[in-house]
């Protein structure tokens, strides 16, 4: 499905919804609006049955109740091996996007991959700057849930990178559990926390949070509740918040992050406190420089060595960018990232 203007005129129906098992679906260049009559109204929904190999690309979802709702609240409609890239999701009441947790797969439809797969979320813009502020809308911009605790799909995971997270008046920008690689993202939240890794309906498993640039009022990166036998690592980030990095657990560790208060971001970044249009999270000349980060194990992840702009990362600059001075790439804004 491509190149369609979808306006539901506030009548309570989703913009796009799958019915039954579906796979190898592409949704591209859609403009979805008029789906904001309540938090329960969704821009793109895949929550009725197992779905796999969906591509959701270059779409705009404006003012929805929930931008994307992938999987179901009971964990029995797994969303598997998806690619979600270059979308703009803004001004939702609830989540910009949620990928639900999964219970043990009671049955596997023909053709559904049972080996290890990854859902990739990259180069999207998630903004709740103008979201309606109420208890009903207190949701993160992006939330991802755990994989099945055992059996097929239990080794699956998420790779989330190159995204721009902008503001949330009531919640964190990102909340996750399961197996997660989270890298080279830009995050600004003047009203609350940025990254929260904690148990939701499943478990916190192997988590890698590296090379992100974060400016937030409260917690920058918080990691708790790691499952026994798994590891959580926070490395090479530039985090400016009241509590920049907080981790707990015997197998959780942080290393080689540059941290400071929210106000200190102005010492390291070109213009971190500005409004969109002037916002510039690129490092000032000579700032955030450090010896090369130990990247052992990171090459398993897609584009692990590409910064927010897609430039090769030499790992001597902390945060989401690989250089200092003048940003040669896309300036963060509420538009589809090229």
Give, region by region, the residue ranges found by the protein language model.
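Surface beta-loop-beta hairpin patches that serve as ligand-binding interfaces in beta-rich domains
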Residues: 252-254, 263, 269-338
